[in-house]
Every structure is written in C-alpha cells, then in structure tokens.
C-alpha cells in the first residue's frame, strides 16, 4: 500500500558506475543514511549515498509510521542500571530525534501526512498503574509534560474499543506516511548536492591509511569517511555489527478506506495507538482513512 501510494512521487536514480571521490560515503538509503547525508552536506562536505535497492526500501519504508520518544527498555530502567547522567543523555537524544522529524518537515516542506498525538493503551490494571507511575516520573525527572492520563472511559472514546483498562495520551508522539517522509529526505539531500545512487550493491570495503574504498558491483567510491546505515542489511560489510543482529519480523495489514461513521467511532482525533502486549499491537489511520494495523512479531536466530 505504501509503495503504490507514492508512484507519482518516486524519481529513479542512477546506479553507481565508475570511480568517484567524496568526503563521506553513506551506505544505506533509509532514514538514518539520508539524515546523515543531509547533516554532512549542511557542513559543506561532499557526500555520496549508495542504496542497494530503492530509497526507503527497507524498514524506513515499511514500518507502522508511528513516532515516539523514549527507548524500548524504558528510560527509568536505563537510569536504574546506568545512572541519571547517562539516562538524561539518552532521553535528550530520544526527544531530539522526534523534534528532528518536525524540523525536517518544516525546513524542506516534506508532505508526509504528519499527525500529532499517540495513545499507549494498557491491556491490564497493572500496566495502567505502571503508566501512572511512569508519567509522574517523567514529569518530575525530565520535565516532560506532554503526557495525559486517560481512564477507561476516555480510552474507549478515543479508540472505539472497550478492551483497554486506560492509557496515556502523549501529545509529543505522532504518525506519518513513512515512504513519503523518506522520499522527502531524498529530495532534501539532492537539493544539498548530495550524490544519490540506487540499485548499487556494496560488495567490499577496503580501509587504507588515508581513505576508505567502497566497492560496488559496478563502481567504486574513495572517501575520507564511511557511514554504515544499513540496519539489518549489513551482511558482509561489518562482522561486529552483523553478529549483533537478531531478525525480528512484524506484520502489517491495511484495510479499505473506512466509512465516515466508522472513522468517527475509531480514532476520532486521529491519534496513533500501541498497546502493552509483549508482542504489541499498533495501529493508526492513514491520510486516506484506511486502518494500518500491525502486530504478531516473529523472532529467529
């Protein structure tokens, strides 16, 4: 659905052929790679981005489109394990990552159906108590005042379901169309004179005393620095990272556009939702008012 939805926005880019030189070679054309390229280009550096498939092809273009701060462990767990100093640094980074999305959208005029607000829905009374404690903790420790506690009745009204015990509305969260955002970053990078190449598979990386040589199936880039932004698609390029990857699959379905009556009943304020199940469910409405629903996580080694 995402890919079919952006055919008019998609511009093809050339394969990397022959030899090139730059300051930074970025491998990977998703959110991380494109954002890295934009920041480097803003500093006046010559940048080349190499993507093995199409820009936004990987997880950046296939996710649920939801935007949240914090970390998967929970910032309170980080603080207990590593101390308040590191926890505060990680919290600031997570919040800056959310702010950066809005900054990019404003700066480059990216049209990606961005909406504000997300609900974390509690599937048990115990989880609701955790939400209450976590909200107070974030207000007191990190001065984060975007969290509104919702009782069961309010969650029922916001989600159109009686399944949940309550939840928290995070006004700093949100959702967007991920491939539209990725392609907006591509256009932003291009405006900053970043050289962009698709369908170019990196086969080998040679580190010399003065440079890095990035070899593809049809060409080579000689760069002062390399940024590996490959996510799980890093096989053969960095064994240290590759050995720390565990494949984790999640599944997403998309409905037909909902009727106006159903839209008013389900997510009337257009918030995104995720719940507290270990294999969580997450869902939102698209700009065309389709339900984008994900869950059923699978792991393999």
Predicted regions, residues:
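A non-catalytic, amphipathic alpha-helix used as a structural packing/dimerization or gating element
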Residues: 85-103, 133
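Flavin (FAD/FMN) cofactor-binding and adjacent substrate-gating region
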Residues: 1-5, 73-79, 103-117, 122-184
